[in-house]
Amino acid sequence: MKKLRYSEAFYSVQGEGKFVGVPSVFLRSFGCNFRCQNFGLDRDRPKEKHNPEVADLIASDKLNEIDKFEDLPIIHTGCDTYASIYPEFKKYMMDKDVDEVVEHLLSLTPEGKWTMDNGQDIHLILTGGEPMMWQKFWPQLLEHPRMQDLKNITIETNGTQQITKPFLEVLASRPRIKLTWSCSPKLSVSGEAWDKAIRPEVVATYKHGLPNSDMYLKFVVKDSIDVNEVHKAVKEYQLAGVECPVYLMPLGGRSEEYELNEQAVADLAMQQGWRFSPRMHIALFGNAWGT
């Protein structure tokens, strides 16, 4: 039985995308094929192995003094979930089998189940890291007896990992579950290469044979340069048959930076007829772990 390596699971409100404000349990898997180390830095900065803040943290003695994941510092640049992607932080991860993961998830819900007595349902968000790197584990999770009242799943993915046949078959066998693909392709502001980050041929396969699924594209942007890239990317996705809503979300892993970009990005979204996604958890909680 395969175990899942994950950094955290928590109960909060969804802060981004289509389901903003919906009570949700988040399961953050470990590992990602990207580093996104340039978020918040100069766009033309040379790509390095680590984001500068992460590099300084790894090189310091601070990690010897930190025992728990939730005590790791929040960084101001790069990927805001850095501890879920860099191998240097493996020691803070949990490795649990499916029974343990299910028990952990349900313990976070108000009533110990996905569908509450009042008829409202709690959403499950598979996030990361890159959750599509754990496709061998997710079928175990969805097939577990205590997951059978789950009604809504969102998979937050960068849209670069091909869906496997076994995972697709399990999803197709559960039409009672509403599946939403929240695809967040990475633009050049992230520091990732276009040909590796923009993979429309991959995203186009996510809904095949899944009539009870939905999808949207969500781009992290800062300025008009990013918007020009969004236009280019959306055209490539459309040519591959991906027709879905497009969201713009402000760059900013901390309240100060987010607030500076929020209004400008909302204006850019309205000018293009695209949707605006806030990062409500930052406004509410300051982008702390477990939010």
Language-model region placement:
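Conserved Radical SAM active-site core
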Residues: L4, N38-I177
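Conserved N-terminal beta1-alpha1 strand-loop-helix module at the mouth
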Residues: V20-S24, N33-F34
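Conserved, mostly hydrophobic/aromatic
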Residues: L27, C36, E130, I155, ...
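Well-ordered, non-membrane alpha-helical segments in soluble/globular domains
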Residues: V98-V102, I198-V203, V230-K232, E259-Q263
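A structural motif corresponding to the C-terminal end of an alpha-helix
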Residues: H104-D121, P145-D149, T205-M215, Y237-G241, ...
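Radical SAM/AdoMet-radical enzyme domain recognition
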Residues: I122-L124, W138-V221, V227-E229, V242-C244
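Active-site beta-loop-alpha junctions enriched in small/polar residues
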Residues: G129-P131, N158-T160, K186-S188, V220-K222, ...
